[in-house]
Amino acid sequence: MVRLEKNDPLMLARQLPLKTVALILAGGRGTRLKDLTIKRAKPAVHFGGKFRIIDFALSNCLNSGIRRIGVITQYQSHTLVQHIQRGWSFFSEEMNEFVDLLPAQQRVHGENWYRGTADAVTQNLDIIRRYGAEYIVILAGDHIYKQDYSHMLIDHVEKGARCTVACLPVPVAEAAAFGVMDVDENDLIIDFVEKPANPPTMPSDPTKSLASMGIYIFDAEYLYDLLEEDDKDENSSHDFGKDIIPKITKAGMAYAHPFPLSCVQSDPTAEPYWRDVGTLEAYWKANLDLASVTPELDMYDQNWPIRTHMESLPPAKFVQDRSGSHGMTLNSLVSGGCIISGSVVVQSVLFPRVRINSFCNIDSSVLLPDVWIGRSCRLRRCVIDRACIIPEGMVIGENAEEDARRFYRSEEGIVLVTREMLRKLQIKQER
């Protein structure tokens, strides 16, 4: 048993994570990302040149001192499981450290898979209890942010809360996609509504609503009792946002934790960074922001590194083609194993092993691993899925009608290209 030094914040920051287990909900399909998630769960989607989305929640746990982690999986989990096995298998069993994969197995309710976010935890309660944690951190595996959970744990303990919900002001126009809360002067949550049609505004700012980030801390035994009670409720949807948090709020046991208090950022004057990259435009925009001169998310902070599975790849190469054209980039991220031959890449993100042949112009695009671009192509405002082969002379992103006919084009004009779409155009996808 770790004795808490409640008067010493530094000691609390070290001690509380040792008494904590993090559960990452990573079974979501992410339908708003369209064909990007047909063959992979949203947390397994590539992001930022070399990472997967789930790497951010996992890295936050590691950097916060939480080294007992359960990852709850369901939809199209193979890619996600493989990534975690390859990139996150360094924890020490002798030190009681682990990343435990918890797939849906129909273990509790016969033919039912996970019926909701809360049920995903309920169906694994027998395993989770054996972890012997005093605190449980519930995390979404599909958000991009940097947060020190030890600071949120301190806030939870000092307030005497049974449940703490991380929150962030969002524009009212966007609030309908979140759980929205109202709090008193002590951060006690006095009202909570999940995805309201008419979101209530913050008294201090009528243009904003106070939104739940889907990050929760519970006293462990309190959570177990709640979930067992919820499991027996036939009228429940077994979801944290729809059922559990509103119930705790009515009991006066839930507190809010302002995200700026635990957000990790290099520039303390900057706006706290948190993104739900759940739509194609949000995903494209968040990736391209990383390639800007001063990105909102600092990926180069050595004090808070983002880990991932590291392949052994040669350096990126920019070469002159036989005609004398130079391969060059501007304001772009280019990962290992990429070769740019006699082409220009501007404000784009290239994942590992991308090959761009001569006379191409790539602008404001995201190219996932193993993409091959033939000669004389022009790509603008695109997301090209893994291992796509773009044939010589293809133009994408310049003709809205043509893009919508061949590929998926969002309302904002972002074009998604997949191997299946190219095959339907009779374009061979094997080299």
UniProtKB/Swiss-Prot annotation:
Family annotation (CDD domains): ADP_Glucose_PP, LbH_G1P_AT_C
EC code: 2.7.7.27
InterPro entries: ADP-Glc_PPase, ADP_Glu_pyroP_CS, GlgC_bac, GlmU/GlgC-like_hexapep, NTP_transferase_dom, Nucleotide-diphossugar_trans, Trimer_LpxA-like_sf
Pathway connected to this protein: Glycan biosynthesis; glycogen biosynthesis
One Gene Ontology molecular-function label: ATP binding
Enzyme kind, highest EC tier: transferase
Amino-acid positions noted as binding beta-D-fructose 1,6-bisphosphate in the UniProt annotation, renumbered to this chain: K39, R419, E420, M421, L422, R423, Q429, E430, R431
Activity modulation notes: Allosterically activated by fructose-1,6-bisphosphate (F16BP) and inhibited by AMP.
Subunit structure comment from the entry: Homotetramer.
PANTHER family, sorted: GLUCOSE-1-PHOSPHATE ADENYLYLTRANSFERASE, GLUCOSE-1-PHOSPHATE ADENYLYLTRANSFERASE-RELATED
This protein's name: Glucose-1-phosphate adenylyltransferase
Organism expressing this protein natively: Enterobacter sp. (strain 638)
UniProt lineage: Bacteria, Pseudomonadati, Pseudomonadota, Gammaproteobacteria, Enterobacterales
Name of the encoding gene: glgC
